Structure formats: C-alpha cells, structure tokens
C-alpha cells in the first residue's frame, strides 16, 4: 500500500525543506536541522514544570506535565525519539501534552544525554535512573507509586523497552505498562521492512545504521539486551504492552516480532498496525488523521480501555 494522501503531502513538505540526511552531516548539524523543522503545539495544561533530576553526579533535565492538580495521578515516563542523537524535551512537547490530556496521566519527559558525545550506557542509565527516581519520590510528585509506566517513540521506544527489562531484572519496583511507538529493538538490517523501506522516507536504512553507530561503542554492544531488547532471553513477567507500528518504516518488522515474542511469553501485548503512514507519524496530531487515532489508542491503553 502506498502512503495515504495526508502522509504523501507531509513527506513532500519535509522534502521541500531540502535538509540533508542525518548520516551525511555532523551530529550537531543533524540536531540543528531537526530543530529547524516546524513543531506542532500541544494543548494547554494547568501544570507544566521544567526540573532537573540529580542522579549521582549527573543532572538530567526533565519536564513534568499534569492534566489536573490536587490529585494523585498515574504517570508515564516518556523518552523522545531521534536515534539517540537528535531530539529533545522541547521537540516532544506537543506529544507529551496530548498524552497527558488524553490519558489523564502525568507525563515526565526526559532529556537524556545524546550520542555520540555520550554513548551507551549513559543515555540508558539516565532513563532508568529517572524512572527509579520517580518511584522513590512518588509522594513528592503526588504520583501513584504502583502505577508507573514507561514509553517512547523510535529510539525512545528502545530506551523504554530497555528500562522495562532492567526494572524487571533489578526487581526493586514494578512497572504498570510500556507504550512503544515504532520502537527500535534490534540491529538486524536484513528484515523485509528494512529492505522495502530502504530509502525515500524520513527514516531510511542508512540513517538508522548511522544512528546505531553513534550510540554504541563497538559491535559487541549489540549483544547487550539493554541495547537490543530483542535479544533478551526471557520475556516472561513483563508488564502489559502496546506497540504501534507504521507500514512504511524500516522498524516495522521488529515491532511486530517483539509483540509476538511477548505473546509467546504470556505477556499481555496489543499491536496496532497503521497503514499508509511512515516513521514519525505519531507526532503529527493535527496534521494526520491517523496520528490522532494512534494518540487516542495510546491514551486508551494507558487508561486501561485496550
């Protein structure tokens, strides 16, 4: 199936910006180019606060969103996409606002350190550390300590899945759920969706390979399940999961496979496949009808309707 009309128009608008692929410029230039793209605003909320969370000797900037005050809320800790190289709390502000308002959850968006200046495991440690900090400081945040979820899109989905695995391994606390939006879960570039979507879209196979090279120290890192969650040996006892995938996306196949692996381990997992859309569509609420549908599905999952 070809891109639907709205997605095709969006792709043409992005191409008209004439921005070079991320793998052909420096990481700094890639960030500047990404930041220059128009951002879609999100809804107004009664509480939005920037904060720094101190983890040992590292200060991690975060932004906390609440859809209502004077109430103990559930929370989703959100990790933005961008191949571990680009992206920011500012760039994902609209997404976080829509998630918070639509679900009734607090959202804590994490500005983890970026590669290649900071390679694995530091960005991952930021994400796990912030999630654990939320658990330890739930009363201060007016958050339900037993109802903490994680989520993210693309590389943020990778980080969310990895945080879920480490939380399971450490057994200090349990997560309520994980929301994975076209997550990057493996470094196998021979999957059919990598070949079929090698070029022509926002995320291409060469760009994705470049992202992996920026994040990892050496090919040996790719054997670490916290880098490639698909390589985790046993998915039993993981929290309920929703995975959203796009058919015009190199990462499509691994999202479907991860869902199937979770089902095989008797984990409650929901997979929603969107056709006619490309990687990145989730952040286009107000532009793409299917982005609004994906946001609604995500919020319903968090609420417990899915």
Locations of the language-model features?
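Alpha/beta-hydrolase active-site loop
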Residues: 118-140
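Alpha/beta hydrolase fold serine-hydrolase catalytic domain that processes acyl esters and thioesters
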Residues: 162-306
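A glycine/proline-hinged amphipathic helix-loop "lid/cap" segment
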Residues: 1-65
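Short beta-strand-to-loop junctions in surface cap/lid or active-site-entrance loops
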Residues: 62-72, 230-235
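Gly/Ala-rich beta-loop-alpha elbow adjacent to hydrolase catalytic centers
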Residues: 152, 156, 160
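Gly/Ser-rich "nucleophile elbow"/oxyanion-hole loop immediately N-terminal to the catalytic nucleophile
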Residues: 135-150, 170
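Short beta-strand element of the alpha/beta-hydrolase
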Residues: 73-82
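Short amphipathic alpha-helix adjacent to the substrate-entry channel of hydrolases
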Residues: 90-108
């Amino acid at each position: 199936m070809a891109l639907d009309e709205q997605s095709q128009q969006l792709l043409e608008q992005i191409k008209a910006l004439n921005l070079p692929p991320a793998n052909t410029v420096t990481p700094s230039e890639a960030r500047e180019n990404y930041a220059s793209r128009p951002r879609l605003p999100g809804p107004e909320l009664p509480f939005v606060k920037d904060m720094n969370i101190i983890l040992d000797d590292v200060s991690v900037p975060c932004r906390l969103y609440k859809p209502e005050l004077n109430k103990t809320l559930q929370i989703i800790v959100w990790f933005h996409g961008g191949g571990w190289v680009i992206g920011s709390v500012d760039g994902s502000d609209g997404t976080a606002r829509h998630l918070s308002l639509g679900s009734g959850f607090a959202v804590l968006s994490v500005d983890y350190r970026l590669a290649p200046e900071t390679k694995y495991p530091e960005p991952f440690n930021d994400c796990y550390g912030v999630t654990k900090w939320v658990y330890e400081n739930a009363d201060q945040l007016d958050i339900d300590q037993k109802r903490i979820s994680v989520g993210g899109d693309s590389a943020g989905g990778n980080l969310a899945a990895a945080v879920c695995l480490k939380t399971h391994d450490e057994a200090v606390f349990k997560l309520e759920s994980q929301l994975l939006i076209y997550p990057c879960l493996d470094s196998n570039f021979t999957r059919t969706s990598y070949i079929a979507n090698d070029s022509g879209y926002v995320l291409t196979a060469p760009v994705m390979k470049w992202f992996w090279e920026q994040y990892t120290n050496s090919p040996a890192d790719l054997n670490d399940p916290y880098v490639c969650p698909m390589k985790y040996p046993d998915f039993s006892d993981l929290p309920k999961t929703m995975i959203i995938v796009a058919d015009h996306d190199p990462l499509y196949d691994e999202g479907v496979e991860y869902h199937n692996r979770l089902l095989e381990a008797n984990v409650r997992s929901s997979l929603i496949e969107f056709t006619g859309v490309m990687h990145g569509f989730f952040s286009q609420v107000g532009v793409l009808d299917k982005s609004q549908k994906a946001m609604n599905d995500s919020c319903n999952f968090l609420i417990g309707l899915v």
